[in-house]
């Protein structure tokens, strides 16, 4: 379990004080993948660097498996950092060392014998899919391969927690998905708790169980990934969800304007099992109404499928529309009126 209680990080400059992290409270379950998303400057990277005390909090407590990180002695902190490891955006590899030697580096520092360090490194090279590249140097690797080395190095000391600070943001979409699949594989095999910092909702949707959304140093929304996708509460969250779902239906409805007085354009939000059910067909027949589908999308999360339909109902009485909405709610479909004539 990771607990953050009223965590604050304030920087002092000669011109002004900067409040980078503002009273953040989080609980992260052991064995889960927890995502923190926000735009640049939201405070998310500062936050994650306080998990292993690369940044000291100005105030508040960060407790990992019962240890208050900012109250450990230097010796205790060094030992704890072996169990709270980190993967960086720009790999941070040692360019004069081979793949094998980059991975053995933290083991050498920890006092492993050369034989033991090599055994562990070769095991990790196999795990991250770099067999045959152990003697290559970083300059000979692709971006995805470099990040695989970074992940293997982070796993060298068998950590309990893996921190990923924008670990895929320097990668192309295909390589990003390959790295995310690798993290899922590692999480299951090593029984890790993973905390991911990102500005990409695609990353959150693909691998995370829960997400916290940050803006201006504060957590503005938090919950299960499926819940946040189904019903985002904050404007920033809605922007992230809209971008990931390619939800840009405004162009699709322009040709329908102006609407007749008894016409509606509605967005139907689906989740879980009802994404595969013939809900629209059922509703159309039950209420004897025409429904035109303007736009649709379904995406998968670790907690189930989420998706939406934007539909045009050319003619429906107001009282009938209320019944229509209630029927959809009974089938766990959220109805949002986009426009009404």
UniProtKB/Swiss-Prot annotation:
It is a peripheral membrane protein. It catalyses: L-methionine(out) + ATP + H2O = L-methionine(in) + ADP + phosphate + H(+); D-methionine(out) + ATP + H2O = D-methionine(in) + ADP + phosphate + H(+). It comes from the Bacteria. It holds the Pfam family ABC_tran. The complex is composed of two ATP-binding proteins (MetN), two transmembrane proteins (MetI) and a solute-binding protein (MetQ). Signal peptide: none annotated. Disulfide bonds: none annotated. Residues 2-241 form the ABC transporter domain. Keywords: Amino-acid transport, ATP-binding, Cell membrane, Membrane, Nucleotide-binding, Translocase, Transport. Its EC number is 7.4.2.11. It is found in: Cell membrane. Gene3D superfamilies: 3.30.70.260, P-loop containing nucleotide triphosphate hydrolases. Its main location: membrane. InterPro entries: AAA+_ATPase (IPR003593), ABC_transporter-like_ATP-bd (IPR003439), ABC_transporter-like_CS (IPR017871), ACT-like_dom_sf (IPR045865), MetN_ABC (IPR041701), MetN_ABC_transporter-like (IPR050086), NIL_domain (IPR018449), P-loop_NTPase (IPR027417). It comes from Staphylococcus haemolyticus (strain JCSC1435). One of its GO terms (cellular component) is plasma membrane. SUPFAM superfamilies: ACT-like, P-loop containing nucleoside triphosphate hydrolases. This is Methionine import ATP-binding protein MetN. Part of the ABC transporter complex MetNIQ involved in methionine import. Responsible for energy coupling to the transport system.
């Amino acid at each position: 379990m990771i607990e953050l209680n009223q965590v604050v990080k304030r920087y002092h400059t000669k011109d002004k004080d900067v409040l980078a992290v503002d009273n953040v409270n989080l609980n992260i379950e052991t064995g889960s993948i927890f995502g923190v998303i926000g735009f640049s400057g939201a405070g998310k990277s500062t936050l994650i660097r306080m998990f292993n005390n690369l940044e000291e909090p100005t105030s508040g407590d960060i407790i990992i498996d019962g240890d208050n990180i900012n109250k450990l002695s230097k010796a205790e902190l060094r030992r704890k950092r072996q169990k709270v490891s980190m993967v960086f955006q720009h790999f941070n590899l040692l360019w004069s060392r081979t793949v094998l030697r980059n991975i053995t580096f933290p083991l050498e520092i920890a006092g492993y014998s050369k034989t033991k360090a090599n055994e562990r490194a070769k095991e990790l090279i196999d795990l991250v899919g770099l067999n045959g590249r152990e003697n290559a140097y970083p300059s000979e690797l692709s971006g995805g391969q470099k990040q695989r080395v970074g992940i293997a190095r982070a796993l060298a000391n068998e950590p309990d927690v893996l921190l990923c600070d924008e670990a895929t943001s320097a990668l192309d979409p295909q390589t990003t998905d390959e790295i995310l699949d690798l993290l899922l594989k590692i999480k299951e095999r090593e029984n890790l708790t993973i905390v991911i910092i990102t500005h990409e909702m695609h990353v959150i949707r693909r691998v995370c169980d829960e997400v916290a959304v940050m803006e201006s140093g504060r957590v503005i929304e938090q919950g299960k990934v499926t819940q946040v996708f189904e019903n985002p509460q904050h404007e920033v969250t809605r922007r992230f969800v809209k971008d990931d779902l390619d939800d840009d239906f405004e162009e699709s409805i322009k040709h329908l304007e102006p609407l007749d007085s008894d016409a509606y354009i509605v967005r139907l939000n689906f989740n879980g099992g009802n994404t595969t059910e013939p809900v629209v067909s059922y509703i159309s027949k039950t209420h004897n109404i025409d429904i035109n589908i303007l736009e649709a999308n379904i995406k998968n999360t670790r907690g189930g499928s989420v998706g939406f339909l934007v539909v045009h109902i050319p003619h429906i009485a107001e009282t009938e529309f209320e019944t229509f909405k209630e029927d959809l709610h009974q089938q766990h479909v959220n109805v949002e009126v986009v426009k009404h004539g």
